[in-house]
Amino acid sequence: STPKPSSAASDVYKRQMINNFNINQVGEYKREGIVHRLDRVTSGIMICPIDSEAFHQLQKDFKSRKIKKKYKAITEGTLKSKTGEINLPLIHSQNNRRKREISKNGREAITKYNTISKTNSFSLLDIDLITGRNHQIRAHFEYLKAPIVNDVLYGAKKVNDLDENTICLQSYDIEFKLFDKDYKFSIDEPDYFSLIMNM
């Protein structure tokens, strides 16, 4: 696994990883790569297997929701409930094709959250991503009127101390089983999370 910085597109980051990887370490070159995506503005862990069998197995496991993905996020304001489950289907927005929006005719999208801490202005959340739709977390919390901090596309205010391509959303923990072996990868929160929560 490898941490992707926010502002790096998954495809671009994949090419960079391949260019930086010494294939002599593993012998014959094989076409593998990233088995899942993160939004361009989201930071965090990405799985990049170099073995063909592992690559295809992990692809299947992502589709069948066997891989546990956890995120941390900071939202504007506070939520009505400290913990909750958001079960709201998503479609492409009719007004902005870059966005997703809630629709009863959309694809199933389930997000669970728990509030870790909060201030008068912000909430730090631990999020379980049950389904993995594009922009799922961002659209769900916009709907709850608690957008991800600095996520201007989804209704948040611009934070002067953050780059426009950085939002307060991080994939920080992934767990999965592969060929009867358990794997768990975790990373620390980025420094700007503390900056926001101390504002």
What are these language model-derived features?
Residues 1-3:
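Short, exposed "boundary/linker" segments that immediately precede the start
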Residues 6-199:
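RNA pseudouridine synthases
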